[in-house]
């Protein structure tokens, strides 16, 4: 681990083994938390952890990282593993009847799976003192459907990870989250993007960011104003918070957000950007396009099949948008190679290799770049 990752462990250990780590994307939140688990293993001779993640893709990514630490007894709780219940039953049986406390395991689950009553009850029956709960993208735990379960989660050892732990317009959820992770006064550990790029030992590369401002169409603006007027009725200007978490308000906020997501003038602006880039360079090698979504990404409350929160392409607008942006790239020049890169894609590893060698010059992607 890097020095700042060691510092995170010390802060966590000195905070009764609870903590909320606010770390910039790319600085190694996963490794930082697994280092805490390894330190327990190094001192106690066992590892016991439950890791919660928003999507199925992250379940698999976390498994890969765990194996790099030589953590091998791993159970993935999601629909694509038909044996997970038997594996959990075995762990629970051993926990209950084994006199040896050194049984080691890691259980990786989507939030959607974990929140199901039977799964929630079974996993919470494990060793309360020894299990380390790691919540990836911990802001998901502040969501109303999860926040009401926090009081029933018994694990003494806790780590919350997020580049953005604060939930926008949800001070109640934020307060519950901070209390749960023992970070009511301040984050247990914080490592900002500025420090990661400009600090004494930088770990992230510098980058250029060029905003291109687009305007809403008249129809989009009219719809945006109409929704804003309805939303304003739920807003308390004295406290700068919403007065309710009513489903009607959520739908209004979502509808307004989709107007921005799908703004029609984004496509011609994108066309100008890539055309200029091609004219300047003669190719579009290593171009990664993050297409706006038809639907708001909803990691929580997702099914999982259980949980299809990681699968896109079922929404007509989603298909239309990614197809339009892909066609836009193809129209730049007949020699440009472009592929769609979406969740659930079987050849994604080969596709990434081809992108790295510029066999595929452009990837158009949606949602699977999140988190």
Regions found by a protein language model. Name each.
Residues 30-32, 45-70, 293-295:
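Conserved Walker A/P-loop ATP-binding site and its immediately adjacent core
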Residues 187-283:
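Conserved interdomain linker/interface between the two RecA-like ATPase lobes of SF2 helicase motors
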Residues 136-137:
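Walker B catalytic acidic pair
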Residues 140-204:
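Post-DEXD/H (motif II) to motif III coupling segment of the RecA-like Helicase ATP-binding lobe
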Residues 16-38:
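Walker A/P-loop
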Residues 1-22:
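Conserved pre-motif I regulatory segment
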Residues 84-129, 143-148, 368:
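Conserved helix/coil segment N-terminal to the catalytic DExD/H
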Residues 84-99, 119, 288, 315-330, ...:
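Conserved helicase ATPase core of P-loop NTP-dependent helicases/translocases
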